[in-house]
Design a protein with these regions (language model features):
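Core of compact, soluble alpha-helical bundle domains
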Residues: 1-132
């Protein structure tokens, strides 16, 4: 089925709103987002444009989301929580096919971001910003 029939940009925006509702209520993610984001309307529009591009092919987002995350105090466990919040939001709002696609994209993003932000593997198998 074509993505146009699966969802529209309003559905994608509802997905983004639901994600941030979940993430901002999370004990670990909430403080990170609150400290980093000063203009929520602008940020949610950017994130919605990203997902509309990724899931619908809307061509509303260009560039990479990596750079703004470089200075944030993100640790390995945050990725698990971020993925869980996205998964929940997708299941709540998106048609199943798009929810699955969003999670495939999110897992790829998490792996890429983790590789860049946490390049050092500790003896216990976890990843870190700095060598031991």
């Amino acid at each position: 089925m074509s993505t146009e029939r699966l969802a529209d940009e309003a559905t994608i925006f509802a997905f983004v709103q639901r994600f941030y509702q979940i993430a901002r209520a999370d004990d670990e993610l909430g403080p990170l987002f609150e400290a980093a984001i000063t203009d929520w309307d602008r940020h949610m529009a950017i994130f919605a444009n990203f997902w509309a591009t990724a899931l619908l092919g809307a061509k509303k987002y260009e560039g990479t989301g990596y750079a703004p995350h470089i200075g944030l105090p993100i640790e390995e466990h945050h990725f698990t929580r971020w993925l869980a919040a996205l998964d929940c939001a997708g299941k709540d709002v998106l048609p199943p096919e798009l929810a699955e696609r969003s999670m495939a994209r999110a897992r790829h993003m998490a792996m890429s971001f983790k590789t860049g932000l946490l390049p050092f593997k500790r003896a216990d198998g976890t990843w870190s910003r700095t060598p031991e």
